[in-house]
Every structure is written in structure tokens, then in C-alpha cells.
Amino acid sequence: MIVIYHNSKRVTRVVSDTLEVIDFDSSNSIASVLMHIALQFPNKSIAWCHQDYEGFVNWNEFPKVLHHNKIMVSFSPSIQIYLGREIGYVEESPFINVNKRVSYPTWQMSSGIGGMQASVLVQFKGKIKECRNFDYFLNSMAKLGMPLGLCCYSEPKLFKIFPECPQPKATIFTLFQFVYQHYKTRWLFLMLFNLMVYEKRLPIFAFLKALLYKKRSNIGISLDSIVVQSSKEVVNEATVDVIIPTIGRKSYLYDVLKDLALQTHLPKQVIIVEQNPMKGSESELDYLKNENWPFKIKHTFTHQAGACNARNLALAQVESEWVFMADDDVRIEAQFIQKGLSFAKMYATKAVTFGCYQANYAEGKKIKHTMQWNSFGSGCSIVRLKENNELRYNTSLEFGYGEDTEFGLQLRNEGIDVVFTPYPEILHLKAPIGGFRTKPVLQWHKEVIQPKPSPTIMY
């Protein structure tokens, strides 16, 4: 590993992990020196560190957190973020409000301490300007790289003890520049509008100056040539439970079970929660007992409808290391579970969401890159919950909106990143029968004044 020490304005020294001093051009920007060192040592990991942080850094953790080639990490002990809370007017993804207690996915990087592989750095050579503002350079690189498969994290393990040092803060001019260069132009106007309405500020000169910069959205960066194989282990027992909430889809669920029975890596047990809100109704899933299955089936029948409740009932019965959260109207290939676990091993991720599309979904609209996901798929994901088996869906969102996203937030706040992979793909049949097709009467539906947006949206 090569470490680049700096004082926020320029590089002060560069040393290797064997304490060899490496020459550099002190007149260049920190970003330029970083890129030059990456070109000089393309097979090394590169770290940057503010000189005031040197005594607080946990260098032993770097090989552990940089466990595969497409990882970029940094950490700032400060509550303040470089781009400020105003960036929340532009982006509402989970990557903005960072949990500093755990390893957390975010493109918001810090110049204080961080690192990545030189092989990734060189892919940005000539693509983005190696400017004097090192924090801007790092944030730009992470923001552009994340949708292309670069896994970016705030990692508190980089410090032994958190130092009390201020986080550099972007000016309002820099903030507007960042928004214009990395988002659609309409967000620049919306941020100006929000600052006017909610903060009584009118930074018109920052707004106008931002329009002079060049966009960075289509600059031809590709990370596909970089091989990923994590040195970290997340698959030990390789046991899998499948949970399936179902309502009124007997034939579709049967096909799902048949697909599971043909798996090259069989699940240990399949947990089915069958719902029928009609009083006096009984289970219609006779084939659960009438046929032989190569896995244990746990069947729960309930009159209480609701996907959140059903999934929670299923999660309480999980015994395996991994959980495949499935739907009752999907189809999967015979090697689905095997390939899913192989991907989890490759990236050492504890939560994987798979591409899940209908048969007529346009091929050109499908996501083709592996990347950190800003949501979560409750019917198309595998998750390692062995250490976090207390996690449950929030029933406040029952029959509403966003329970998938909220469960994903719970995972991230436990230090579990959600990674999307396009393969193996799940076919979603979107069954025309069953499911939750009766519109529920929620608490606020009979109110004279209807809340807009609805409480579940505002939640």
C-alpha cells in the first residue's frame, strides 16, 4: 500500500507500507499526485491521509476493508459533511444521511482518510479534472463511479480513535457546481428554488456561475475490466431458507415451489405464509402435503392480510444463514440460488437484490451493471440475517408505500450494504389473480380533509 499524506492544500510526503519514501512533484495538486502514484504503482492500493490524522489511523484495517478491487472507502469523524445538508434538496437516496457508527454505503467521500485500488483510480485519468479541491475530486469520482460498480463506503474502522478535526466545507459556489456537473440541470433550478423558499437565500451568482462548467455525466468511464474477488468470507454454512408470502395464487405458488425443487443448491426450508382475510376460509394449498418436496416446508395460514405482517411471520421462523425473499408469482432458473451465493461470495456482500422484470420488459431499459442499490427488493433478494435476525418490516407501512425501501434502510443501518446484480435474472409474472387487489380502508380515508401526500409517503 502507498500512503499519500497531505495538509488539505498540497501533498507533504508519500511513503510505502515498507516505509520507503517515494518522490513526487510538490507543485501538483493532491489529486494529480494521487493519480501519478496510481499510474506508477497500478497493482497497489493507494491511501490518502491528512497529516494531522496520522496518529489516529488504524492501518491494519485497510487490507480488510479494501477486500476487493472495486472498493473506495473514507471516513470523516465530523457530523458536518463536505457538501452540507443542502445536498438533500437535490438527492433523497439513502446515501446522503450517513450512519457514522457502521460501514455505510455513500458516495460522500472525505479527504481526511481513505483509500482505493490504483487500478480503479487510473480509469478516471483524463476523465475528470485533477483539481486543487481534493474533497471535490474524491466526491466527484465516487459519485460517477458508484453507478458503474464502484462500491463506496464511509468506514469508521479506519480510525483507532476519532480525532477532533474539522471537515472541510464546500462553498455555495462549489455546491452549485457539483449539482450542475453531476445531476440533471433541472435540479440546479430546484435547489435555487428550495433555498429561496425554505432558507430565504438567493445565491444567484453561484447559480449562474455553475452553468459555465462542463457536465460530467457522459465521460466514458468503464470499470468492467477490473476483476472482483473478495478476500472476505460471508458465506460459511451456505444454508438458505426461502420466505414466500402468498394470497390467492395457488397455481403460481406451485410453479415457484417446482423451481425451488429443481435448484442445484437446494434450500433448507421454504416458509410459506398464506393469507386469506375471509372469515371461515381455510388453506387451499393442498399440494404442500400431497406431494413430496426435497426441502422442509413450514406453512402458516392467517386471516390477517398484509405483506409486511406475512413477511414478519416468515422471518420469525428463519433458521438458515441466508434468506431468499421471494414472491409467489416469480420464476427462477435451476442455478439461481447457487449463482446468488456465488455472487455474494465474490463481492462479500450480505444483501443482494437481483434484476426482476416482466417478460415484455424492454431489454434496453434493464440495468446491466452491478452496483450499490438505493432501494431493496422484498421479492427478489437474498440476505444474510444470521447476525441480524431481529430485523422486521415496519407494519406502519402496511398497504401503503415504501416498506421495501424502509427495510433496506434498516439493513444499511446495521452495516449491511445492498448490492444489485443483473444476473441471475428473476422473471416476474405479475399474476392477474390474487395478491392485494382489494383496496384497503386506511385510518385517514374517512377524514373530511384528505392528507396530501399520504402519511405513508411522508413517513
Model segments located where?
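N-proximal low-complexity "stem/linker" segments adjacent to membrane-targeting elements
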Residues: 1-18, 160-161, 197, 201-262
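Acidic donor-binding segment of Leloir-type glycosyltransferases
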Residues: 8-10, 19-23, 257-301
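Glycine-rich, basic loop-to-helix element that forms the pyrophosphate-binding segment
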Residues: 25-39, 299-318
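Conserved donor NDP-sugar-binding/catalytic core segment of glycosyltransferases
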Residues: 38-88, 334-367
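A recurrent flexible, glycine/aromatic-enriched loop bordering the glycosyltransferase active site
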Residues: 79-82, 92-116, 366-383, 442-448
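Acidic donor-binding loop at a coil-to-helix junction in glycosyltransferase catalytic cores
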Residues: 132-140, 400-409, 421
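Cell-envelope/extracellular polymer assembly enzymes that use nucleotide-activated donors
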Residues: 140, 238-243, 269, 406
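Active-site-adjacent helix/loop segment of glycosyltransferases
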Residues: 148-214, 428-459
